[in-house]
Amino acid sequence: DGYIPDGEMFARWAQLGAFSPLMRFHAKKDLFWHPARTCPDGWDGGSRLPWEWGPTVLESIRNSVRLRAALNPYIYTLMRAAHDTGVPLCRGMYLDWPERDEAYRFDQYLFGEAFLVAPAMRPSGDGQHGVTERSLWLPEGAWYDYFTGKRLEGGCEITRTSDLRSFPLYVRAGSLVPMTEPGDYVSAPLTTLTLRAYAPVGNCRTTFDLYEDEGENFDYEKGLNRRTLLTYDCSDGIQRLSVETPRGDYPEAVAERTCNVEIVGTPKPALVTVNGVVCNTWSWDNDLLTVRCGTVSA
């Protein structure tokens, strides 16, 4: 009925909300749930204010909100695709694997093409800081644990243990995910763009047609929007990320932005180039390559 019984439940709801079409914390006009309910300490609880639940829950919810905001370019593009094609943002596993029993048996789903979401379903028992575990199915192919960067081979059922800082969230190898710095509101201009790729096993070619519009009006119905084709190409040990010239425009579109590239699960490169010029503004740590490309034309 929307009542929040404990902090652990609140944090898990926020994690699920971050990977839902709509994320919000309110269910009615009040900050607290009324009428009052009996709680062990005499306090009604039910608050929708994350800081009312202590530092551990606050940190967990803050991380979920930041992750949701960082994924806004990915989510906004897929919401436009859902509008155009009817293919939902949240997809049952059976849409991609209709013949597999596991696709119906596990309560998990795809969030676009890249993410596999398996929400934490069982409480730890202490209501705040505990560890819980759940089983899930990883389809064939390689998948990355989003929170650790560890690569796993699919085609199996696994058990994942998590505290409130994480939950079972996996990214398909070969994926290209556009991200941004979390801002004050989701329709803020896309002035910072991070292209995060997840290294495949072998060769691959992945595209993502990034969509942008003003975000707060209906001018997109008049064709006022912009699309930018992003490509991640891996072949013979060479990885390439390319950004094509945008198609279309709208008055509020940014003319330039800060661009970064991240590649998860890649060995340390011998050479990095940007537009054919040797680049020295890169770092590599624990199989994560980060390239700071600076300000580029949008």
Report the location of each language-model feature.
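Catalytic-domain carbohydrate-binding cleft regions of carbohydrate-active enzymes
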Residues: 1-166, 171-172
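Alpha-helix initiation/capping motif
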Residues: 6, 54, 213, 283-285
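Short, surface-exposed charged micro-motifs
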Residues: 107, 135, 229-231, 281
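Beta-strand-connecting loop/turn residues
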Residues: 113-114, 141, 237-239, 286-289
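Beta-strand residues in well-ordered beta-sheet regions across diverse protein folds
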Residues: 118, 146, 242-244, 292
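Solvent-exposed beta-strand/loop surfaces of large extracellular or lumenal domains
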Residues: 145-164, 271-294
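Accessory, solvent-exposed terminal regions and/or long lumenal/extracellular loops of proteins
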Residues: 169-277, 286, 294-297
